[in-house]
Amino acid sequence: MQTTHLGKNSPIPQSPEEASLDYVPNPRQGKNYLIRFAIPEFTSLCPVTGQPDFAHLVIDYVPDKLIVESKSLKLFLGSFRNHRAFHEDCTVGIGEKLFTEMKAQWLRIGGYWYPRGGIPIDVFWQSGAAPQDVWLPEQGVPPYRGR
């Protein structure tokens, strides 16, 4: 198992393009199970105004041979702090990158964005039909009411 960040002092990358994700062998290959990451304080910048945007992200996936190493994921997500992109681009881009690089069996991401201009925007993406033999709990983020 070769990791770039785990056990090392790693600064937050300046952009998502500079960030690298580490993957490690799935310790339970052959078993279908769900891994969930909840990121309640995700931050990026509006591509037009440069104002900060905030979201609660929930990433669920069913791994195949690899799982994402959580420190590298934290650094990757932190790299969006100074990244200008629309909510949709951030949410779907994160999901696609993880799914494609990790070659997960299935992945979904929910981006629950806090309102700017009075309108919350929630963005959802998944790689395909959910597996039938895996417990898929609700993401548990209520509709906006001062989340």
Curated annotation (Swiss-Prot):
GO molecular function, one term: preQ1 synthase activity
Keywords from the named record: Cytoplasm, NADP, Oxidoreductase, Queuosine biosynthesis
Catalytic reaction(s) noted: 7-aminomethyl-7-carbaguanine + 2 NADP(+) = 7-cyano-7-deazaguanine + 2 NADPH + 3 H(+)
UniProt pathway annotation: tRNA modification; tRNA-queuosine biosynthesis
E.C. code: 1.7.1.13
Protein location: Cytoplasm
CC annotations in GO: cytoplasm
Biological process, per Gene Ontology: queuosine biosynthetic process; tRNA modification
Active site: residue positions: C46 (thioimide intermediate), D53 (proton donor)
Amino-acid positions noted as binding substrate in the UniProt annotation, renumbered to this chain: V68, E69, S70, H87, E88
PANTHER family: NADPH-DEPENDENT 7-CYANO-7-DEAZAGUANINE REDUCTASE
Family classification: Belongs to the GTP cyclohydrolase I family. QueF type 1 subfamily.
Protein name: NADPH-dependent 7-cyano-7-deazaguanine reductase
Organism: Zymomonas mobilis subsp. mobilis (strain ATCC 31821 / ZM4 / CP4)
Gene name of the record: queF
